[in-house]
Amino acid sequence: MNRLVIGTQRYSSWSLRGWLPVMMAGLEVEVQVIRLEAGPSAAIAQETPSGTVPYLEHDGATVWDSLAIAEYCAELAPGLWPEDRIARAAARSAAAEMHA
């Protein structure tokens, strides 16, 4: 089963950062939302190997961390990053800054 485990996108910017590239790449996944308003939950620990969201299972790959998910999606949908190397470097720098 292909799935993306996230927290509520409005509450968890990390989840939103994982969800966006998956949607932009057009990956067919079941999105499983775990409510995070009350803080970390046992449900996250049960559903993900790292105990964090976002977490992606896709075609045999298991990927956690929003930036790793974005890179995985970009490998499947190369148009996610700019084609020009200078623009791509700037985009990756911005993504890394948001990730830090």
Which role fits each region the language model picked out?
Residues M1-A100:
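GST-like domain detector, emphasizing the conserved glutathione-binding G-site
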